[in-house]
């Protein structure tokens, strides 16, 4: 598997919410990442895919809720988010598509 394909396995999709839009005003971009990826992998993937310099990476894991479907209990998957802060002068425009 090539290095670029591995980077696409780390970064799943951008997250566009009100909170992520407010974070983008401070130079941060929010991505959904694979649950087993770590901060150095996320930093390397963002720098190689988008050609920017990363200042910091903060991650959070949101536990999946227990939901009921047709009387059966099920669980939504856990989601890991990465708040990637970029160096001054670097931007990623996720609203236009990747």
From Swiss-Prot:
<comment type="function">
    <text>One of the early assembly proteins it binds 23S rRNA. One of the proteins that surrounds the polypeptide exit tunnel on the outside of the ribosome. Forms the main docking site for trigger factor binding to the ribosome.</text>
</comment>
<comment type="subunit">
    <text>Part of the 50S ribosomal subunit. Contacts protein L29, and trigger factor when it is bound to the ribosome.</text>
</comment>
<dbReference type="InterPro" id="IPR013025">
    <property type="entry name" value="Ribosomal_uL23-like"/>
</dbReference>
<dbReference type="GO" id="GO:0019843">
    <property type="term" value="F:rRNA binding"/>
</dbReference>
<keyword id="KW-0694">RNA-binding</keyword>
<dbReference type="InterPro" id="IPR012678">
    <property type="entry name" value="Ribosomal_uL23/eL15/eS24_sf"/>
</dbReference>
<keyword id="KW-0687">Ribonucleoprotein</keyword>
<comment type="similarity">
    <text>Belongs to the universal ribosomal protein uL23 family.</text>
</comment>
<protein>
    <recommendedName>
        <fullName>Large ribosomal subunit protein uL23</fullName>
    </recommendedName>
</protein>
<dbReference type="InterPro" id="IPR012677">
    <property type="entry name" value="Nucleotide-bd_a/b_plait_sf"/>
</dbReference>
<keyword id="KW-0699">rRNA-binding</keyword>
<dbReference type="GO" id="GO:0005840">
    <property type="term" value="C:ribosome"/>
</dbReference>
<dbReference type="GO" id="GO:0006412">
    <property type="term" value="P:translation"/>
</dbReference>
<keyword id="KW-0689">Ribosomal protein</keyword>
<dbReference type="Pfam" id="PF00276">
    <property type="entry name" value="Ribosomal_L23"/>
</dbReference>
<dbReference type="GO" id="GO:0003735">
    <property type="term" value="F:structural constituent of ribosome"/>
</dbReference>
<dbReference type="GO" id="GO:1990904">
    <property type="term" value="C:ribonucleoprotein complex"/>
</dbReference>
């Amino acid at each position: 598997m090539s290095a670029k394909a591995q980077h696409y396995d780390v970064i799943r999709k951008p997250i566009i919410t009100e909170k992520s839009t407010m974070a983008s005003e401070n130079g941060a971009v929010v991505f959904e990442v694979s649950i087993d990826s770590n901060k150095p992998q996320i930093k390397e993937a963002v720098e190689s895919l988008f050609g920017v310099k990363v200042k910091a990476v903060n991650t959070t894991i949101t536990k999946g809720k227990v939901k009921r479907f047709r009387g059966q209990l099920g669980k939504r998957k856990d989601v890991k988010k990465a708040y990637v802060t970029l160096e001054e002068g670097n931007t990623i425009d996720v609203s236009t598509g990747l």
